[in-house]
């Protein structure tokens, strides 16, 4: 390839990523500038809603993170390695396709006062949940599927599974294997995964608006409400509340690291002391309950929807935005993987590892400054900040595993780098690209805050309509909105899986 073309493609890859990640800079400025005023801090801490909102946020986050980790590790202890683990791993993409808002809507319609459970058992009155425990439990169930999905990758090493089998054969039970072998091996990567879970839970606005607590709400919802007001003083309080979310994330990360360091020092040496094998009934029950929860969510929404139809405009907008955002992200990421840097690009994971609310504030500031708020293209640009890193998470491992000998053979045949990219690497990436498209579409469907702010309310989606209806409205229409929000990603996953199977018939390496 001629040097000018290579430089042009490298520049294009960098420009695409910088345009998408540009809001990180104004987000930092908007968070720091109010923090320099002592009066703004006084106004924030003087607000009577802050202590309860902070407490509800901390409690719901701890319940969600610890619960998701417990469910995932209990299932690993019970099923891994084995055929049942592989069977569950094959069903995880379908569970991940269920958006948080759809799952939360089903939970609301089942357990809330006036829901199905309340109608069946009138004596059952849901207790007041001012600490966000119900929110945390719901997110724990939903996020456990994500943690399990990552664990399927981390536990895919043949060496690790072989060592567990050896421990089993020597008489050590599964809990000893988990404590002495599995956790120490995967702890660094698992820590990053849990950081992403905590970051998402801290800034969950849509799910918290559906499930509560209501008054005062969680800190993310409170910050969202302040930032949405026209008063500059209230907006400063909202920015400081967003900064508090970042500080809470740092605090959770520090506490998690300290717990890991302390726990690692307590690891005993293996002196041959066996413990009796205890049936892992909880893990087996959870492995059955997790897919069942997804199935019940879909059935409940289908029953409650009855003859109600979703908003056609919201359905079309969701489909268009999700398709365009995922396709654009795929093209951009393939360019980035081929012509981007090989090292020192960890900043691309920041949207996953940081609370979403400050990033949306940065996006909105850029859109206002450029006069592009309320535009359809701006809406797609806003979704790319979260669609791109999740799709890169799917694409990057396969890209790095491409056999360099294939590239060497192509080079000896005189192929140019652009020809190698188009005729060798892209066909090899077809299957992960299809999976990435489905993941990107699902991530785009779930976006609430960027859609509402960057679209200026002009482009309703299934997510925004479901959140709006959750505060009051027709149960059937809410169920229909949430059902279609669930069905769209599921249909895309089925479509990409079918295409992958069809293409793999003619390509042995892709089966």
Q: What positions do the PLM features span?
A:
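Flexible interhelical linker loops that connect adjacent transmembrane helices
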Residues: 259-289
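Membrane-water interface segments at the C-terminal ends of transmembrane alpha-helices
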Residues: 2-35, 45-156, 185, 189-206, ...
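Short helix-to-coil transition segments within interhelical loops
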Residues: 156-161, 165-186, 408-429
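Short amphipathic alpha-helical coupling elements at transmembrane boundaries
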Residues: 39, 43-46, 89, 122, ...
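Loop-to-transmembrane helix entry/capping segments in MFS-fold secondary transporters
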Residues: 86, 166-167, 235-238, 408-410, ...
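Short cytosolic juxtamembrane segments of multi-pass membrane proteins
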Residues: 264-276, 457, 500-511
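Helix-loop-helix hairpin linking two adjacent transmembrane segments in secondary transporters
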Residues: 226-243, 247
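Glycine-rich helix-loop "coupling/hinge" segments at transmembrane-helix boundaries
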Residues: 206-233, 446-476
